[in-house]
Design a protein with these regions (language model features):
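Phosphate-binding P-loop
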Residues: 3-8
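Conserved glycine(s) of the Walker
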Residues: 15, 20
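N-terminal phosphate/diphosphate-binding loop that engages ATP/GTP or pyrophosphate donors
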Residues: 22-72
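ATP-dependent NMP and nucleoside kinases share a basic, alpha-helical "lid"
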Residues: 62-72, 86-142
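Small-molecule kinase domains that catalyze NTP-dependent phosphoryl transfer to phosphate-bearing small molecules
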Residues: 110, 143-211
Length: 211
């Protein structure tokens, strides 16, 4: 049974901007290198030093639109005139090979991937310890004006946090390493669920028969 390939799981991280999603994912992958990222598809031009299929899959606007129409792109967003999306085939092939995936997606993106892979996806919502702390973290990033920060906080309160009931787990990101360990504990528990290990368990001789 040790040689059997267990189907991988998809851990999807969502939450308000500034709650620390990227830091949590990076810390989790550093502690557990068996976690894998998903290569996204984009309409952005390839840059020097980038490789097809490693950094992104590069498509024209027409090709991207076709992938949306055919359902191959599960979710997508637009930034600075370029589209970025998640490929269904990219996820399917990796979890079939036993790879455990971790993704940072918008709330609508998380719900879309969960709908496409209901038995394989686990959704985790990240909360800040307080709204005041969320504001502080957004200010610390030095990326946005005060008006933009207020808009992000307002969006978190009115649109994002109310969606928390659609997620499987909720983690409050106060101390990064604690949140990382909680996330890894969630992934470990999900790996050990019976429905994810039925084929392996069926190969074990647990009848206890004696001659």
């Amino acid at each position: 049974y040790r040689n059997m390939t267990r189907r991988g799981i998809i851990t999807i991280i969502s939450g308000p901007s500034g709650c620390g999603k990227n830091s949590i994912i990076k810390a989790a992958v550093e502690k557990n290198p068996l976690l894998s990222y998903v290569t996204s598809v984009t309409t952005r031009e390839i840059r020097a030093g980038e490789s097809e299929g490693v950094n992104y899959y590069y498509k024209s606007q027409e090709e991207f639109a076709h992938l949306i129409r055919t359902g191959e792109i599960l979710e997508w967003d637009e930034f600075c005139g370029n589209r970025y999306g998640t490929l269904k085939s990219e996820i399917s092939s990796k979890i079939a090979a036993g790879m455990d995936l971790i993704l940072d997606l918008t709330i609508s993106g998380a719900i879309a991937v969960k709908k496409a892979f209901p038995e394989d996806a686990v959704t985790v919502f990240i909360l800040p310890p307080s709204i005041e702390e969320l504001e502080t973290r957004l200010q610390y990033r030095l990326r946005e004006t005060e008006a933009q920060i207020r808009e992000r906080v307002s969006n978190a309160l009115s649109n994002e946090i109310p969606q928390i009931g659609n997620f499987d787990y909720v983690l409050i990101n106060d101390v990064l390493n604690d949140t990382r360990d909680q996330l890894l504990a969630v992934i470990t528990a999900e790996r050990l669920k019976y429905n994810r290990n039925k084929e392996i368990l069926e190969e074990l001789d647990l009848k206890g028969e004696t001659v």
